[in-house]
Amino acid sequence: MVTFLLKKSYRLKDLQEIDFKDLWGDHGIFTTMWIFGNPPKILFFKNHLSNLLKSLKKYKINKRFIKNNILQILNKNLSKKKNYNHLLRIAINKNTISISLRKRLIPKLNFNLKLVNLRRERPQFKNLKYKKILSHLSKMNNTKSDIGVVFNKKLFETGTSNLLFISNDKIFTPKKDYYEGITYKFFKSKV
């Protein structure tokens, strides 16, 4: 079970704090970022924010000042004094912005994948239609296991990461029907 350091939700129209909603299953978008250090830094923050905003437009959740609202909520909730090694999740639907912070788990070397026949809805977006994946992940020790998302006998990604296969100095990945993560895009740009 995941332990959260922070869970907050805000009404999008006026940024009033409301009871926390994780928004899983809703029509919306999320991003998960590694926040580390003191003072805190977020790995690839500009890329995550840009991708989140582009995806929100595609999902027709295009509110004025949404970027500033996100930054305001983060500044209000993240401590400049805390030493972080956490995962920060921002989730947005048409009415709500939710943020949560959980400890970053370090994967063990002897890692395994449980193959699960599952098709993600609109996999090119990091959307909130993630309940089936979460139901599998919640039954596992995520430092040792993840799921492999398989559809039509093809392996596309894991429940938490992209897949990269390397052979003879060439990188192989699925061609389509998977979410291209920010870290994946970074590595792809370096090859």
Regions found by a protein language model. Name each.
Residues 78-86, 142:
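Short secondary-structure junctions
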Residues 1-76, 93-191:
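Helix-start/capping segments and mature chain N-termini
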Residues 84-94:
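Hydrophobic/aromatic-rich structural module bridging two neighboring secondary-structure elements via a short loop
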